[in-house]
């Protein structure tokens, strides 16, 4: 088994209809694949958006709301409905699912970070599938672009996953926008994320979600620097999860850093909040940049 512990991330557009409402058929396609991988012995985590999509209709909104308060209210209703769909589908295959709602503060505070990691480890050991989302109802920052892409990368690094798979309706990473540029070429393998790669990513490509290819590239950076390989591939294919798990997906693969950052450096680099200032002389600057320490 090449990748035992896998984090899958599905965005809102991957589990909704064209009108923005939840698609039970798309969710069933995802859970069917998760169940098959679970039976094969994989340890699985699902980071799923979709709470707003699941809830706005129940509150009487005709379309996906725009105002923050309306989104948060929709998420409060929709998170339970979203979990109900996942739980019903997975339990029919004898799989226990667990809901975990996280926010930026859970990563910034080291004790909460360690507690979350401990809970996830127990769930995986007990063969449950944790289903994770941002805490949309109380977190304003979460509703901005990049939420669950970044969250999935942070979770993958936290639990030392063997693979992160970002499922999207935007088909892989190209050198340009394939919808407007017929000469755009798909990038199958990315060994280093540089400024050119970031430029290629562009902006959001979906009307129903909050993230685009650029947020996925940023998420891939976090995971790859932490030693976790990353796939970006289409959620529209019936066996996309299984293909990614076997390293056969028709998508863009990001090669991880050979020696991933240790847990302490991960936390400092990606999760902790910067406060105050530190001034160093030229000698210390050279030692820190070249050797990673000044003593």
From Swiss-Prot:
Family matches, as PROSITE patterns: GLUTAMATE_5_KINASE (PS00902)
Gene3D superfamilies: Acetylglutamate kinase-like (3.40.1160.10)
GO CC, alphabetical: cytosol
GO biological process terms held by the UniProt record: L-proline biosynthetic process
Keywords: Amino-acid biosynthesis, ATP-binding, Cytoplasm, Kinase, Nucleotide-binding, Proline biosynthesis, Transferase
Superkingdom as given in the UniProt entry: Bacteria
Enzyme class: transferase
Signal peptide positions on this chain: none
Main location, first listed in the record: cytoplasm
InterPro entries: AceGlu_kinase-like_sf (IPR036393), Asp/Glu/Uridylate_kinase (IPR001048), G5K_ProB (IPR041739), Glu/AcGlu_kinase (IPR001057), Glu_5kinase (IPR011529), Glu_5kinase/COase_Synthase (IPR005715), Glutamate_5-kinase_CS (IPR019797)
Residues annotated to bind ATP: 9, 168-169, 210-216
Binding-site residues for substrate, renumbered to this chain: 49, 136, 148
A GO MF label: ATP binding
Pathway: Amino-acid biosynthesis; L-proline biosynthesis; L-glutamate 5-semialdehyde from L-glutamate: step 1/2
Catalytic function, reaction form: L-glutamate + ATP = L-glutamyl 5-phosphate + ADP
Entry keyword annotation includes Transferase: yes
Enzyme Commission code(s) on record: 2.7.2.11
Family of the protein in this entry: Belongs to the glutamate 5-kinase family.
Function text: Catalyzes the transfer of a phosphate group to glutamate to form L-glutamate 5-phosphate.
Entries under HAMAP family matching the protein: ProB
Name of protein: Glutamate 5-kinase
The organism of origin for this protein: Neisseria gonorrhoeae (strain NCCP11945)
């Amino acid at each position: 088994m090449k990748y035992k512990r896998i984090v899958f991330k599905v965005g809102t557009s991957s589990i909704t209809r064209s009108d923005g409402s939840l698609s039970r058929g798309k969710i069933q396609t995802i859970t069917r694949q998760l169940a098959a991988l679970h039976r094969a012995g994989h340890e699985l985590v699902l980071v799923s958006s979709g709470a707003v999509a699941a809830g706005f209709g129940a509150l009487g909104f005709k379309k996906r709301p725009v105002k923050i308060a309306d989104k948060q209210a929709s998420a409060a209703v929709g998170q339970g409905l979203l979990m109900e769909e996942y739980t019903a589908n997975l339990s029919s295959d004898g799989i226990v699912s667990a809901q975990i709602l996280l926010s930026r503060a859970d990563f910034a505070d080291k004790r909460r970070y360690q507690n979350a990691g401990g809970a996830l480890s127990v769930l995986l050991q007990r063969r449950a599938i944790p289903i994770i989302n941002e805490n949309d109802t109380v977190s304003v920052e979460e509703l901005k672009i990049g939420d669950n892409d970044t969250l999935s990368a942070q979770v993958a690094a936290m639990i030392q996953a063997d693979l992160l798979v970002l499922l999207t309706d935007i088909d892989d990473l190209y050198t340009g926008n394939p919808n407007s540029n017929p000469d755009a070429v798909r990038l199958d393998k990315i060994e280093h994320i540089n400024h050119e790669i970031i430029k290629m990513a562009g902006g959001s490509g979906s009307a129903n979600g909050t993230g685009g290819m650029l947020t996925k590239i940023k998420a891939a950076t976090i995971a790859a620097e932490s030693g976790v390989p990353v796939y970006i591939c289409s959620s529209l294919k019936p066996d996309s999860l299984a293909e990614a798990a076997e390293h056969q997906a028709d998508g863009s693969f990001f090669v991880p850093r050979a020696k991933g950052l240790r847990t302490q450096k991960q936390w400092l680099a990606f999760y902790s909040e910067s406060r105050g200032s530190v001034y160093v002389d030229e000698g210390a600057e050279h030692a820190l940049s070249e050797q990673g320490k000044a003593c």
